[in-house]
Design a protein with these regions (language model features):
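Transmembrane helix-loop junctions at the membrane interface of multipass transporters and ion channels
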Residues: 157-182, 353-365
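Juxtamembrane inter-helical linkers in multi-pass membrane proteins
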Residues: 42-50, 98-128, 207-232, 312-323
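Cytosolic juxtamembrane amphipathic/interface segments immediately preceding
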Residues: 1-3, 59-69, 107, 223-239
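Extended, low-charge hydrophobic alpha-helical regions
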Residues: 30-69, 111, 131-147, 252-375
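Long hydrophobic segments that form regular secondary structure
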Residues: 203-211, 220-264, 274
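Membrane-embedded alpha-helical segments of transport systems
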Residues: 125-131, 150-166, 184-194, 298-304, ...
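Hydrophobic alpha-helical transmembrane segments
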Residues: 2-54, 60-93, 175-199, 242-252, ...
Length: 375
């Protein structure tokens, strides 16, 4: 503990653990995602045999709309989510997370809130919905509202595909170690935003000084593989995957309709992208990328597939996910656009499920709208 919670050694070890966690997630998930997407693509022959008697329009809607979107989201998020949650559960099981909260307590005290917020931020790193629900541990309602409204500034697992793809464009190559460092920097950037907004909200709420943070550091424990796998896979990964798949299917159908219906020689989706080009350029992006963020409202994992589909002008059933950074670069996405996308991905509205959790936990539409607007 003298080393792990030391003023000088503690933050360095914490940052190193984050880098190693992200690096192992990237190394393990890259090939798995390619294999998974390849397996989904090979089902096309089986699908054509089963649906051969269907009307062509219906078969195309099911394959290039519902199925392709759901398969793409699954291939993008399942491997990194499973690996990340397993590694994160190891840190949780050995008793490190309370020590991470102890390291940041003095920072939160200066911001007028409690060190317990660090635990909710760690939960938000996996899923912001879980982080918002975890804000129940905050001792006062004011501190709970502050923690809830700032939790979405921590990039969750669903935003990793966007951060990694744009990060690879910014770096000019796909290097796992450099991307792990970039992810760590994104988390630190989000944490900095959390500290700043927490400080402002604590002043606006005119609350009393934070109550003393009494934290009992649990003893170190040997990791229990069975418990870790059960909690990480069944308790977290499959829960997040099922939520993403449930919203990906109808979103895919809507995307298919917008891509199929032609007006004036252009699809509705392309016309919408052209309409939003002005707003996108103000943010350093373009209309296609902005649409990707808008369609990511149900699930953040939808952003990159939608952006690739618009920029490459291919359907989700034919546009390959592998080499997303190379495809983005080939479509004219430069370093400036990638950098703006990285910043916007860290600081943008929460997903719909997180907004529902915020509405449920706060019981206030005003705080829900504020939490959506703050990032």
């Amino acid at each position: 503990d003298a080393v792990l919670t030391g003023k000088r050694t503690g933050p360095v070890i914490f940052a190193a653990l984050l880098i190693v966690l992200f690096w192992l997630t990237l190394v393990g998930s890259n090939r798995c995602s390619d294999w998974l997407q390849s397996g989904f693509d090979r089902l096309q022959a089986l699908f054509l045999r089963v649906c051969g008697a269907w009307p062509p329009l219906l078969a195309d809607a099911v394959w290039n709309g519902v199925y392709a979107t759901t398969a793409r989201v699954t291939a993008v998020m399942l491997p990194p989510a499973a690996i990340f949650f397993c590694l994160f559960s190891v840190l949780e099981d050995v008793g490190y997370l309370p020590r991470a909260a102890f390291l940041t307590d003095h920072l939160f005290e200066r911001c007028g809130t409690s060190g317990r917020q660090a635990l909710t931020m760690c939960m938000g790193l996996g899923c912001n919905t879980v982080g918002v629900t975890g804000c129940r541990i905050m001792p006062t309602r004011e501190e709970k509202l502050i923690a809830i409204s700032t939790n979405a500034m921590i990039p969750c697992n669903g935003r990793f595909p966007m951060l990694l793809a744009m990060g690879a464009v910014l770096l000019g190559r796909e290097n796992d170690l450099l991307l792990a460092l970039l992810l760590t920097a994104a988390v630190c950037l989000g944490a900095s935003g959390t500290f700043a907004v927490s400080f402002l909200l604590s002043k606006l709420l005119h609350r009393k000084p934070p109550a003393p943070f009494v934290l009992e550091l649990p003893p170190y424990r040997r990791p229990q593989p069975k418990k870790i796998l059960t909690d990480a896979i069944f308790g977290k990964t499959l829960h997040v995957l099922s939520r993403a798949a449930l919203v990906a299917a109808p979103a895919g159908l809507i995307l298919w309709v917008l891509c199929t219906v032609q007006v004036g020689g252009m699809s509705l989706l392309q016309q919408l992208a052209r309409t939003l080009d002005g707003a996108g350029e103000l943010l350093g992006m373009n209309g296609a990328i902005l649409i990707g963020f808008l369609f990511a409202l149900p699930a953040n994992e939808l952003a990159i597939p939608v952006i690739l589909m618009l920029l490459t002008r291919q359907s989700l059933g034919t546009a390959p996910e592998a080499g997303a950074a190379a495809q983005l670069a080939a479509c004219g996405v430069g370093a400036k656009t990638a950098f703006c996308c990285l910043i916007f991905s860290v600081f943008h509205w929460p997903c719909a499920t997180t907004l529902q959790a915020i509405r449920r936990e706060t019981g206030s539409l005003r705080w829900t709208l504020l939490s959506a607007a703050l990032p």
